[in-house]
Amino acid sequence: MNLLKQIPKVDKVLSWEGVQTLLETHPRPVVMKAVRNVLEVLRAIVLREEGDAGLFTDEAIMKRVNRELDEINSLNLKRLVNGTGVVIHTNLGRSPLPESVRQTLNEIAFGYSNLEFDLATGERGSRYSHVEEILCELTGAEAALVVNNNAAAVLLALSSLAAGREVIVSRGELVEIGGSFRIPDVMRQSGAILREVGATNRTHLQDYSAAVATETGLLLKVHCSNFAVVGFTAEVSAEQLVELGRQHSLPVMADVGSGNLVELSRRLGCNEPTVQEFVSAGVDVITFSGDKLLGGPQAGIIVGRRELLATMKKHPLLRAVRIDKLTLAALEGTLQLYRDERRALQEIPTLRMLALSKEELAETAKRLAARLQKVVPPVVTLALVEGFSQVGGGALPLLQLPTTLISVSVGDKSAQEIEKVMRLSPVPVIGRIFKGAFLLDPRTINEEDISALTAALQGIVP
């Protein structure tokens, strides 16, 4: 405990020449915060009976103050390297945007724009008009509307079309969409009355039909994109639900979630329905995300019948969930690529990464490991192992994409120790641990990441 006496007071540290130099270029409150944080850490070290006298020299404390000041001044939201192989990683920002969107964002962010100004008439315009035409073109729908995320899209649609009335939905489709947000909760918040039908694993058309009453306002289908029920199962198709809706003059709504706009089945060996299929089936209102399989920014997209979307456009809630100009610019830029499907598959990072073959990834991993091995310390060993990538983002939960992983080993360091060092690098590198090994998946690592990845690997050994 005598070491506590060696910890200087804040005022004394502030009087040091090195700190005085910092005060010339940094606000005093910020420097004081850095000093206090460092001294508090030193006190905690002493109380844990760790460390030695070398921690309390003026030079050692000054180094800590400089590091702490850098940390305080750094942005919390920062770029990192996704080496997990999870393409649409919810915690890592989901879909990276296409390179072609970068210039558009720069122009819109740092200047004025015609966000709500009609250049043709010189009068007030609508922000939603910028993407409505292209969304209708790509999906075949009559009308389109965009808000800030898919949960907001569902909330707006139900609030506009079914508040105070029953919404019939299969019990097996009452999904949790992440972050403890559940479809039943969103429905209740909208003012709609939840009417569950069927069983968890099997729901039939008769279940919906028997539940239709004068209180019914809407039939809802939720595409279960973030989980799968296998075995003894049955579900009602969109076409069947639409036919039932027509018989009772009820609108049918589908929450498609993942927002797939291209045929993925032959490329990935999966059966993920497209938004266009729901439109062709006659579904009246369809909602989906912009930052999942679509590969754009976070947004909630609504397409469907013109008169129903007109009702939503007049609802007061729309103002609270409206899309901002930067998201709108990024979304329009991404959607433009879908006019040429081949271009979309090549230039939208999410689609490009998903389409990489096992052979392509094996060659990429081989080249990357050889390239890195030349510049990392000798104690760092890189090896190739076969494995699988995941789609992520609540899409295609059963799909495993074959890949070749790079296993990183460093002397007697554990995988957890390696993971921590990589994660705390100036540009964090996030990998995964499997069977006691720290692994990097080249599927989600691009050329721009290599310098940061190299620096992180070089920093493993002090």
Curated annotation (Swiss-Prot):
Pathway: Aminoacyl-tRNA biosynthesis; selenocysteinyl-tRNA(Sec) biosynthesis; selenocysteinyl-tRNA(Sec) from L-seryl-tRNA(Sec) (bacterial route): step 1/1. Belongs to the SelA family. Its cofactor is pyridoxal 5'-phosphate. The keyword Glycoprotein does not apply. Its EC number is 2.9.1.1. The lineage of its organism: Bacteria, Pseudomonadati, Thermodesulfobacteriota, Desulfuromonadia, Geobacterales. This is L-seryl-tRNA(Sec) selenium transferase. One of its GO terms (cellular component) is cytoplasm. It comes from the Bacteria. The modification N6-(pyridoxal phosphate)lysine is found at K292. Keywords: Cytoplasm, Protein biosynthesis, Pyridoxal phosphate, Selenium, Transferase. Its main location: cytoplasm. Coiled coil: none annotated. NCBIfam families: selA. GO terms for biological process: conversion of seryl-tRNAsec to selenocys-tRNAsec; selenocysteine incorporation. It is found in: Cytoplasm. GO terms for molecular function: L-seryl-tRNA(Sec) selenium transferase activity. It catalyses: L-seryl-tRNA(Sec) + selenophosphate + H(+) = L-selenocysteinyl-tRNA(Sec) + phosphate. Converts seryl-tRNA(Sec) to selenocysteinyl-tRNA(Sec) required for selenoprotein biosynthesis.
